[in-house]
Amino acid sequence: MPLEKQREALKGGVPRYGETPADCVSRFDTSAEILKTPCGDGIMVWRRWGEGAPVLFFHGNHGSWTHWIRNISVVAERYSVFCADSPGLGDSSLPPSPYSLECIIDAFEIGIKDLISEKVPIHFVGFSYGSAIAANTALRFKERVKSLTMCASARLTATADIPRVMKSWRRASTDEDRWEAHRHNLAEMMIAKPECIDDLAVYLQSKNAPRARIRTKEFIPRDSLINALIGLRGVPMLNIWGKEDGFFRAFLESKTELIDAN
């Protein structure tokens, strides 16, 4: 799609007034340049909007590029926005077996080398699980990292034991029950204010969760993020938290041990 038409497609609310969640996602999807790079025995799917310095967005676990749907149009006004579906999630194929952090990062490294010109500086942005993937990918391009931004990074805490009561959407007997399970889980995991859990948020969760085909907690070490950050000393970094995030207090309690000491 020509850049001017893409910009027109990205204008307006997310969603626009009267636009259904499905139509909103379709608008962003059809306006994107779809790119494919190798991943295991299949492909890794990337979406690109805008032009300028590259900004790479890394989504959270059980997610896809749509985790960034409210950010894309703003950032694409000044930058080239790249959103990849991480291996085993969203539209991307499974990574090679046995699964490991390294095989996930390998796929990102191959993709970046294919899609972005050599030596061009890159901004890396990660949400939750995506923060660990962003940081470890950035480590392979250390001389090209313009900045690293991490949002809600539970791996920057010393504990994973935050009590949450989740509902199984898989065992829901009706579409309505399944929808409410996704709404409940968003409230437990991601969104503190009930009024912010709109139909778009629940729709995205309902489409992303069933496409998660790997359990990353089983093979990605908890210290993978902090170890990458140690290797990235000197890189401009930004760490963003919601003050009601269950892990935020744990982050503050862990900061002296995990961040300041390193």
Where on the chain are the PLM-derived regions?
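Alpha/beta-hydrolase fold catalytic core
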Residues: M1-V55, E77-Y79, K119, N262
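Active-site loop/oxyanion-hole signature of alpha/beta-hydrolase fold enzymes
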Residues: C39, F82-G126
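Conserved HGGG/HGGXW glycine-rich cap/lid loop of the alpha/beta-hydrolase fold
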Residues: V45-D91
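Conserved alpha/beta-hydrolase "nucleophile elbow" surrounding the catalytic nucleophile
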Residues: H59-N61, G126-S131
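Conserved catalytic-core motifs of eukaryotic protein kinase domains, centered on the activation segment
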Residues: H67-I69, S92-P98, A160-I162, A250-F251
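Flexible "cap/lid" loop of the alpha/beta hydrolase fold
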Residues: A132-L139, K146-E176
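Conserved alpha/beta-hydrolase catalytic His-Asp/Glu region
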Residues: T159, E176-G234
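Conserved loop-alpha-helix segment in the C-terminal half of the alpha/beta-hydrolase fold
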Residues: L238-N262
